[in-house]
Amino acid sequence: SLGLVGSEMCIRDSLVTGPTGSGKSTTLASMIDHINETRNEHILTIEDPVEFVHKSKKSVVHQRELGQDTRSFANALKSALREDPDIILVGEMRDLDTISLAITAAETGHLVMGTLHTSSASQTIDRIIDVFPQGQQQQIRIMLSNSLCAVFSQTLLPKLSENGEKKGRVMAQEIMVVNGAIANLIREGKTSQMYSAIQTGAQHGMQTLETALALSLIHIS
């Protein structure tokens, strides 16, 4: 299930990041399911592979799988923009073409959600910017600051019983909401200052991974 911040971020352009096996696909599937149950939208997902099958509820959902329905994320995104979806889920932003098309889609009014293999919000911004040639990077910073609304960087922790046995896993998330201060840091290339902004941004729904880990330990115990 989604918490309040997660539900709010469903109506915005967001990225979910973390290492392999950190639950990124599950988080995005929860967001898609929330939208599907509550809003009348056209949702298009591009995945490798399709891990969660979504039946149309209030929304109409179309799912595309790499290798079966399309050759690449970039090709699928190009086709997607011709199908007039309201929401596009990009399973993984792997290369310049995919990232560029995703930013363009967000700038043209589509809600775009996607994943990257990064471990923090600041690393996510750096990874996106660094994909582009030096001469394009400032323009991409501006575009990203205008279109990005949130980054969720997550990890999964083992949940232990009182006798030390594993009882599943619990998720901890760093949450960066792109308010005016964060947007300025993106535009100015000051990603090193993002952690401090996240620390002081609790009133906007932000939290550091350390705070999330502390809350997870309380929840586990």
Question: Where are the predicted features?
Answer:
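Short, flexible helix-loop junctions that flank or precede catalytic/ligand sites
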Residues: 1, 7-8, 12-217, 221
